[in-house]
Amino acid sequence: MKFAEHLSAHITPEWRKQYIQYEAFKDMLYSAQDQAPSVEVTDEDTVKRYFAKFEEKFFQTCEKELAKINTFYSEKLAEAQRRFATLQNELQSSLDVQKESSGVTTLRQRRKPVFHLSHEERVQHRNIKDLKLAFSEFYLSLILLQNYQNLNFTGFRKILKKHDKILETSRGADWRVIHVEVAPFYTCKKINQLISETEAVVTNELEDGDRQKAMKRLRVPPLGAAQPAPAWTTFRVGLFCGIFIVLNITLVFAAVFKLETDRTVWPLIRIYRGGFLLIEFLFLLGINTYGWRQAGVNHVLIFELNPRNNLSHQHLFEIAGFLGILWCLSLLACFFAPISVIPIYVYPLALYGLMVFFLINPTKTFYYKSRFWLLKLLFRVFTAPFHKVGFADFWLADQLNSLSVILMDLEYMICFYSFELKWDESKGLLPNDPQEPEFCHKYSYGVRAIVQCIPAWLRFIQCLRRYRDTRRAFPHLVNAGKYSTTFFTVTFAALYSTHKEQNHSDTVVFFYLWVFFCIISSCYTLIWDLKMDWGLFDKNAGENTFLREEIVYPQKAYYYCAIIEDVILRFAWTIQISITATTFKPHVGDIIATVFAPLEVFRRFVWNFFRLENEHLNNCGEFRAVRDISVAPLNADDQTLLEQMMDQEDGVRNRQKNRSWKYNQSISLRRPRLASQSKARDTKVLIEDTDDEANT
């Protein structure tokens, strides 16, 4: 592997600009070599003066890079020392409180089931648990800084060696000895001391002297690329996806056959549509995860996941494939229920019962930690006014806004099973008397409109909570206003629908109000998508016209296509209104909703790429590479300042005005590969070292 590729694969993305610009140095050397005057057409003194002038410029640039690296390393080292002192104080305070309250000095003597502990003991137990997590994140930051130290030294050594080879001189090696090998970032060994001290503290104070357990907690898997999934996971992904494709083909033929003989298919579609959207969402989220990893967007940090244990894209594909198989089998069973002894209404209940059990299964199987994380996140979303709102909280609430059809179909299913289903019949497709008007699929009884507003309500109260915490009207109250437009849109849609059914004279008034608020809502959300969520249309975008100053994904066309796609799908309701308002055929609205619901999930899938990219660039601007975890809570002023930094509209702008030369802004970013596979006491990140010039 060439060192340039090795460097790009192992850097910490959030610190990318603080590394040696190896590619820019290579371009300088090759450009100087190509533009050098030939000895055949000019005298030797002219050639020497040319290279002397170039070397002066080259070494001046090296000095600037070295100063930049020294400064950043010193700042991060000082930050690490302060953080270590803080963690030690927090640990000592927790141990002192335990000692005073129980008269014991070791954690081993205090170990007993959590439900047997008093309130004070529960608090201390949580503090110790938080400290373990905080030390593991701090240890990760130390490894990243050590990796930064080693990569930069290797980069200087290789580029100066290349300099000497191209210019046929030894001045590069001399410059390295005089400047690089005595530079603070290389000579300072405090980082190694901090790593050793952290290992000792975790081993002796938090793991009762069990070094193997301590190192298992501290070390992380290689992060230079996506973590390879186990072979059996890869096998299951292929197996489940293959079966799912075959079953879908079977479903198509079965559906064509059944639609020719049975016209009561719409209750079935409404009940199974939500399950399909959930499977589509999980599959597209797997593609999101793969794309983020490939581009170097650190979604693990953004969502504050455990870097040692989180779902990869293959795991998400596996879950989507497994649920897809259950969905297909259940739907096929409904199609062939007339020849079965099991009543047709059992199959949807069995499908969604299995899905719910998969999520809430209390045993530590089937990705227990990830499911538990999701359940906690859902709880935080639905109790938003009572918690501080983090990125993962409002990200999930935004996903629910695109999955509102699932909630509406769930409400329909509950209503259908409660009021419309004939439990004493078992033939046909979810029997419903076609002579009786449908009750559950209409707005007339009010519940449907309320359910449709739930996702927007969750984001609305999250925005109000963030305003309460920060006291900043912009962007939080303005964002709340965006979600409030959904309430008006749904209200007038419901009023129009009910008045149209009853042939009221004021139906047209509610229709125009519905259209008006649809236009307001679509324009509002579109502008927010492009400007605030994606950070596009930046006036300082430079060569990235209509985009932003800094982009992560390699092709600008991705951004332009995403903008067009977002505009089209944000205004797709115009087609729905046009058709439903001019057509009186039954189930036209159902057909359009069934077509547009998967498209909305796809729109959110595209939105996810650029929303997390924008958040990642904010982390890069703050050089934030690990989670900030502390037992001691932030005071109100610190919390407000942190929220302001996170919500800064131009948080990713104006970061490249002082560039000394240009380099490719779209370079593929990947997280650093850490030394998790080294021996127990060897925590140093090994940098690939080769003297083969073909690999440099």
From Swiss-Prot:
GO terms for molecular function: efflux transmembrane transporter activity; inositol hexakisphosphate binding; phosphate transmembrane transporter activity; virus receptor activity. Signal peptide: none annotated. Residues 366-383 dip into the membrane without crossing it. It catalyses: phosphate(in) = phosphate(out). Phosphate binds at residues 398, 401, 482-483, 570, 603-604. One of its GO terms (cellular component) is plasma membrane. The modification Phosphothreonine is found at residue 690. Keywords: Cell membrane, Host cell receptor for virus entry, Membrane, Phosphoprotein, Receptor, Transmembrane, Transmembrane helix. The keyword Transmembrane helix applies. This is Solute carrier family 53 member 1. Belongs to the SYG1 (TC 2.A.94) family. Residues 1-228, 297-309, 384-388, 472, 535-553, 627-696 are cytoplasmic. The lineage of its organism: Eukaryota, Metazoa, Chordata, Craniata, Vertebrata. Residues 158-165 are annotated as: Important for inositol polyphosphate binding. The SPX domain plays a role in the regulation of phosphate flux. Inositol hexakisphosphate (Ins6P) is bound between two SPX domains of the homodimer. The SPX domain has high affinity for inositol polyphosphates and its affinity for inorganic phosphate is two to three orders of magnitude lower. Pfam families: EXS, SPX. The record marks 573 as: Gating residue for phosphate transport. One of its GO terms (biological process) is phosphate ion transmembrane transport. CDD domains: SPX_XPR1_like. Residues 260-264, 338-343, 423-429, 504-506, 586-587 are extracellular. Homodimer. It is a multi-pass membrane protein. The keyword GTP-binding does not apply.
